[in-house]
Design a protein with these regions (language model features):
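Membrane-embedded alpha-helical bundles of multi-pass transporters/translocases
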Residues: 1-218
Length: 219
C-alpha cells in the first residue's frame, strides 16, 4: 500500500516536472508577452533550494516525512489553484504564485526517495521479506509512465486549444486563453494526485514509521 501511494504521487510529480517545464514558456510568450520574466523565476528557485536543504530535515525530524510532505503539497495546491479560479493579469503576481507553488514541489522532490526507502523497509517489516529490485523497478516505471503521460497530454492539449507552432505565428485569442488554462491546470492535477497518493493511500505516519524501524532494529 505505501508503494502504491508513492507511485500515484510520483505520477503527479512527473506531470509537473515534465508537463509544466514543457509548456511554461508558452504562457510568458503568448499570454504575457514577457519572456524576460522567466529568468527571474529561475533565479528565485536558487534561494528556495538553499533554504529547503537545511530546513526540510529539521521539519521531518519534528513532524515526520508524511506530515511535512502533506504541508508542502497543500501549500503548493493553494498557490496552484489561484491562477485557475481567477485570471492573473499581472505577470509579476503570476510569477510570485509560480515561485511559491514551486516550494512545495521542491520539498516533494527532496523527500520522495526517502518514502521509497520506507516502502522497502515496510515490506520487510510487514511480510518478513525484501523485494528491493522489484519495488524499485515498479517505482521507476511509474516515473516513466508519468513523464510519458505528461508529454503526450501536453501535445494533445496544445492541439486541442488550437496552438500553432512557429516563431512568427500569431496565436488566436482562443489559443492564448487555452494556453493560460493548460499551463495552470497541470500543477493542480499534480497536487490532486500527490494529495491522494500521500494523504489517502500512503499509510506510514511518523508514529508508525518509528515503530517500524524500532521493531526492525530489534530483530
Amino acid at each position: 500500500r505505501p508503494l502504491i501511494g508513492v507511485m500515484v504521487a510520483t505520477l503527479g510529480s512527473m506531470l509537473f516536472i515534465t508537463g509544466s517545464n514543457q509548456v511554461r514558456s508558452y504562457i510568458f510568450k503568448e499570454y504575457y508577452a514577457r519572456t524576460d520574466v522567466m529568468s527571474i523565476i529561475s533565479l528565485a528557485t536558487i534561494p528556495i533550494l538553499v533554504i529547503c536543504f537545511p530546513l526540510v530535515p529539521k521539519l521531518v525530524a519534528k513532524f515526520g516525512k508524511k506530515a511535512t510532505l502533506m504541508a508542502a503539497i497543500i501549500s503548493s495546491t493553494i498557490f496552484s489553484v489561484i491562477p485557475v479560479v481567477m485570471e492573473i493579469k499581472n505577470v509579476y503576481v503570476y510569477s510570485a504564485l509560480v515561485v511559491l507553488g514551486t516550494i512545495g514541489q521542491t520539498v516533494f522532490t527532496m523527500l520522495i526517495w526517502a518514502l521509497v526507502t520506507d516502502c522497502l523497509d515496510y515490506s520487510e517489516w510487514k511480510f518478513n521479506e525484501r523485494s528491493d529490485g522489484s519495488m524499485y523497478s515498479l517505482y521507476t516505471f511509474s516515473r516513466k509512465i508519468g513523464s510519458t503521460i505528461a508529454s503526450t497530454g501536453v501535445s494533445f492539449g496544445l492541439a486541442a486549444i488550437g496552438f500553432v507552432s512557429g516563431s512568427n505565428v500569431v496565436q488566436t485569442a482562443e489559443a492564448v486563453n487555452g494556453i493560460y488554462f493548460l499551463v495552470n491546470i497541470i500543477p493542480v492535477v499534480t497536487c490532486i494526485l500527490e494529495l491522494v497518493g500521500v494523504g489517502l493511500i500512503f499509510n506510514l505516519n511518523k508514529e508508525t514509521t518509528e515503530r517500524m524501524y524500532a521493531e526492525l532494529k530489534a530483530k
